[in-house]
Structure formats: C-alpha cells, structure tokens
C-alpha cells in the first residue's frame, strides 16, 4: 500500500495506468483502507455556466463569458478539442433568450462532443425536500430542549420563516433555482455531480449512448485549462476534489470534483446535511462536510493530511486560473 499523497500524485498525473487484471491500489485515512477506484477515459467531463445577466451578451454571442480575463467559453471549446473522444457537458441556467438558445445549438453543431444541458430539463426531484419539513424539524428540535436551554430568538425566526414560504415554492431545489449568486451555482453543481452519467443520458442528447447512467463524471470549473488528454484517473473510494493551498494552508474546494459513480455516498452525506439545516451552504456543508463525514474526518486528524488524501490534481490541468483576475460575477 502506498501513502495517500504519493498514490494521488502518481496516478492522477496519468503517468501510469493499472491493467484490468491488476489489483487496485489502496490508500488509508483515519484507520480505514480505500481502493483507488478508476475513472476511465470515456467518463464525461462536465462544465457549468449559470448566467445571472444574460443581457450583457451581444447578438450572435454564446452566453458564456469569453473575455481576455475570463476566456471560459474558449476553455470549454479547447477541452472539447483535446478530449475529442469524451462527451463534454455544459450545465447551463439563466433567463436566456430564444436567440441565445440558438447560439447554444450552433455551439453543439460546431463541436459535436459538446452537449448543452439546461438545468430546467434535468430531473433533480429525487434530491429535493420540502422547506417546511426542514423548518419544522429545526423548530421541533428547539422545542425539545428545556425552556432554559432554548434559543427563543432562533425559534421565533424559524417560525416566521416557515410562515413566509411562498405558495407553490415549498422546495429546497426551487429555493436555489431562484437565487442568482454563488450558492445557485454551487448547489446545482452538487446535484449535477450526484447524477453523474445520468445527467447526460436522461436529456436524450445524441452521442451519449456509451455513457452509463450509473457512472460518474469529471466536473471542472470553466477556469480550469486542459492542456492534454487526462487519461484514466484514480480516486480514493471513487471521489476526489480540487485542493487550494495558500501559505501552506490547504482547503477543500469545489472547482474540480471527480466521481466514478452516480450518487456517491460522500455527496449524499453532504446533501443530508443540506436537508437538515436552515442555513446550510452547498460548498461548506454539501461538499466539505459531506466528504469529512464520509471519510470519518475529525479534529483529531491533521486537516492537511486529509486534503492530501482527497486531492485531485493533474499535470494536464492548469487549475483556478481566475485567481489571477477579478471575479466574473
């Protein structure tokens, strides 16, 4: 068995590949061994562009940002050219005009392996929960405490929020669908990666017949630049994420999430947390705490060691290029 850091660097960099008959390598964390599960060369790559201001695009423009500072559309097209044997999905959402939707069609026609997937066309209902149930569960929890231990201010807020749920909008998913900030982006990224291959197959797009609905996907932010084919990837228990490092302090990020199967239990754990809190965050809770729960991370472990264990990096990906420019939002 190899150390977690060495296995991840060695295999993610695509410098070796295990044969079909070779036993899988294993890595350990918190006293438990995990197989380095393969993510094969047919696994689709997924990008995402949720556009809060579609009116900023001119006539004949694909409504995905493509400026000198933020060449996101060019990065997606470049990935499609390099990974020409993979399906490249782009999950999109926004109040697009008819003409802008035609531009998406033109993009698909010009690059046959690019598939535009509209968020509203994907069935995410299996991941939903009534907002009223979330509020009621939190209210009942507060009410179960002795009177001296209750947070009466919070209890009042919860009751007020419960009353203010709009008619016909009693849905966790619908509440995020109406947002136009980073949590809008982050929440549906989590659901898309949970669906994995099913995100591609259920939309009926041509060219997706070789994708298994139970398979995984490789999610990359549009500021991640692919420079060559990724090959076969390996991840502990079939999941890994991008890790940022600033002044030797590491942190889990959601700019890249790779999974070998749909409904990965680490992301399901994060979704369970999202469904239990009224103030949950799709990045901190849905990804970070979900991973920690799944892999039994606690404050007793070294956080940097955990980040090394779960890190996705690849010699053929230049990550997080937008860190050098201002936000595109």
UniProtKB/Swiss-Prot annotation:
Mn(2+) binds at residues 223, 320, 322. This is Protein-arginine N-acetylglucosaminyltransferase NleB. It holds the Pfam family SseK_NleB. UDP-N-acetyl-alpha-D-glucosamine binds at residues 48-50, 72, 219-222, 322, 327-329. It comes from Citrobacter rodentium. Protein-arginine N-acetylglucosaminyltransferase effector that disrupts TNF signaling in infected cells, including NF-kappa-B signaling, apoptosis and necroptosis. Acts by catalyzing the transfer of a single N-acetylglucosamine (GlcNAc) to a conserved arginine residue in the death domain of host proteins FADD, TNFRSF1A and RIPK1: arginine GlcNAcylation prevents homotypic/heterotypic death domain interactions and assembly of the oligomeric TNF-alpha receptor complex, thereby disrupting TNF signaling. Has preference for host FADD as substrate compared to TNFRSF1A and RIPK1. The active site is at 253 (proton acceptor). A motif (DXD motif) lies at residues 221-223. Its cofactor is Mn(2+). Auto-glycosylated: arginine GlcNAcylation is required for activity toward death domain-containing host target proteins.
